[in-house]
């Protein structure tokens, strides 16, 4: 039988002939928690570590995943804590904890392992790092994963709602048509789970475009990076010159929040690589598709994204997936500094606003469902060239409506002030929408995107059965979403029917760059092999999205 005892110097294993110090601290199991949600579960040991160093008593609390006890490194809690060297000491430390943990009845809690909205026992709550927001919630019922709880809201709980609202107004007044549109996008990201539940999906990207040193990234970080980092680092920003896998893993951590990818710049030696990488990221987020890769399975489709750039995306397909905001001159440094000085109040407004939303959740959800149903009905009856941009402006107006409705209901503004602000914000959003339309039209004309392209040509071949998908081994469907086609077959049909003069490689590169191919998991090939024959595998849902985003010629084929 293994015997252990604790001493002021740590845990000691008592053998028949000798005693051995396992570690230099005494762990006490405070609780055992069984955390569970619909997707994941975890058993946690809640430990209190106590040790005496140079006559001073040191006490630290730590939670350990039951499955990874053997990997526990006490020095990560405090450099003075240590397990004695050697595998036997490590094994005996684990055995000591397990011998006590097995005799404790676990406390069951709901497991929160990501930011954003959660539903538990019919109640909706919102997780902002170490903070949970909801109506009459009992915090003891929830366990927040340490990877999430390590993020602390950088806010001031003692400031008044009036002060916090004024901080919001100061930010929105930094630059008309820029800081206000940016703020509405950040607030939209917090409301996105609610919008989705009401029947409206709003996956889109804010594209901040301006010259270098225009302070656009600083402005975006001020609006969206609301977690405290003791090192003073920006926790939600990653550079575009990082690897795609690194960017994808980073963005996946910010589910239902905003992350920043910075920046697409004009360096001629790297511009093409950066643009291709930016295209990959924006299509995953905007289209709600997961990039398959053997090295990562991170899902970024629920992350709201701000992309900063010195240059525009030069295709309607790419730019149409974003909400464009031009930064034509440097951001006013005096106003920016003023807002930075009161950023804790700004972030306190986010908390106040979310508390109001979740206290009135059912009523707001019901109202949104009615509004969205009317909008979607009207939208389906309307033919519009750039539908996504129209949806972006609509959802921005919806967010503005609820933002200032909160202020009115909390008596922060009068009814007349509410009407004035609402009218002014609608005009700002309409102006931004018009800039987007003008830019899209300009790009379409200059690049020839109003003409037929391979995506539209293939769409027409499928729609009018120019391609036989029933009896042709070179072209067939798998399920409802995947088109398998030999590249030679694709080249022959498109070149003949639409008078193109493109090579096989051109078509392969074209559809790969549009990010609508299903590639091999290692990403080395753009084709898939079946019975030693290689096929392009095209996702039809993404082909349709690609056509919809540049649909000016589709009417010609009806």
State what each model feature region is.
Residues 1-177, 223, 249-250, 254-257, ...:
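Conserved glycine-centered beta->alpha loop in an early N-terminal alpha/beta scaffold
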Residues 275-294:
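Conserved catalytic/switch belt of AAA+ P-loop NTPases
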């Amino acid at each position: 039988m293994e015997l252990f005892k604790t001493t002021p110097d740590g845990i000691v294993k008592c053998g028949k002939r000798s005693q051995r110090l396992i570690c230099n601290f005494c762990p006490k199991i405070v609780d055992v928690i069984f955390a569970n949600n619909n997707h994941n579960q975890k058993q946690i040991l809640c430990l209190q570590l106590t040790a005496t160093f140079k006559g001073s008593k040191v006490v630290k609390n730590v939670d350990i995943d039951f499955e990874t006890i053997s990997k526990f490194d006490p020095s990560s809690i405090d450099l003075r804590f240590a397990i004695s060297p050697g595998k036997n000491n490590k094994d005996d430390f684990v055995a000591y904890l397990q011998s006590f943990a097995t005799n404790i009845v676990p406390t069951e809690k709901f497991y929160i392992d990501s930011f954003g909205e959660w539903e538990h026992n019919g109640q909706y709550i919102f997780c902002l790092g170490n903070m949970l927001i909801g109506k009459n919630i009992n915090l003891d019922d929830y366990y927040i994963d340490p990877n999430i709880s390590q993020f602390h809201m950088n806010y001031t709980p003692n400031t008044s709602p009036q002060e916090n609202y004024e901080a919001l107004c100061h930010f929105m007044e930094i630059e008309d048509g820029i800081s206000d549109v940016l703020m509405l996008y950040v607030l939209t990201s917090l409301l996105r789970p609610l919008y989705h539940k009401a029947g409206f999906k709003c996956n889109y990207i804010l594209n901040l475009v301006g010259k270098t040193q225009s302070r656009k990234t600083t402005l975006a970080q001020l609006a969206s990076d609301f977690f405290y980092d003791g090192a003073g680092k920006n926790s939600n920003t990653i550079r575009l010159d990082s690897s795609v896998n690194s960017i994808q893993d980073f963005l996946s951590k910010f589910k239902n929040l905003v992350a920043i990818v910075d920046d697409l710049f004009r360096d001629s030696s790297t511009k093409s690589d950066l643009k291709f990488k930016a295209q990959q990221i924006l299509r995953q987020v905007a289209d709600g598709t997961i990039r398959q890769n053997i090295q990562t399975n991170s899902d970024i489709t629920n992350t709201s994204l701000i992309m900063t750039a010195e240059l525009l995306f030069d295709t309607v397909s790419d730019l149409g997936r974003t909400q464009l905001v031009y930064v034509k001159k440097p951001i006013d440094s005096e106003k920016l500094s003023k807002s930075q000085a009161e950023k804790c109040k700004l972030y306190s407004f986010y908390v106040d606003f979310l508390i109001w939303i979740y206290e009135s959740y059912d009523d707001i959800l019901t109202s949104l469902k009615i509004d969205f149903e009317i909008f979607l009905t009207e939208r389906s009856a309307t033919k519009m060239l750039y539908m996504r941009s129209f949806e972006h402006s609509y959802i921005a107006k919806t967010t503005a409506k609820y933002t200032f409705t909160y202020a009115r209901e909390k008596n922060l503004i009068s009814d007349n002030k509410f009407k004035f602000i609402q009218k002014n914000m609608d005009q700002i959003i309409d102006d931004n929408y018009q800039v987007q339309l003008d830019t899209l039209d300009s790009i379409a004309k200059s690049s020839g995107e109003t003409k037929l392209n391979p995506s539209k040509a293939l769409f027409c071949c499928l729609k009018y059965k120019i391609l036989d998908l029933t009896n042709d081994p070179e072209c067939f469907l798998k399920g409802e979403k995947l088109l398998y086609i030999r590249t030679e077959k694709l080249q022959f049909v498109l070149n003949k029917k639409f008078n193109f003069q493109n090579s096989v490689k051109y078509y392969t590169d074209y559809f790969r760059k549009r990010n609508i191919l299903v590639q091999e998991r290692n990403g080395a090939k753009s084709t898939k092999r079946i019975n030693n024959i290689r096929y392009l595998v095209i996702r039809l849902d993404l082909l349709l999205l690609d056509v919809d985003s540049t649909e000016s010629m589709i009417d010609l084929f009806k």
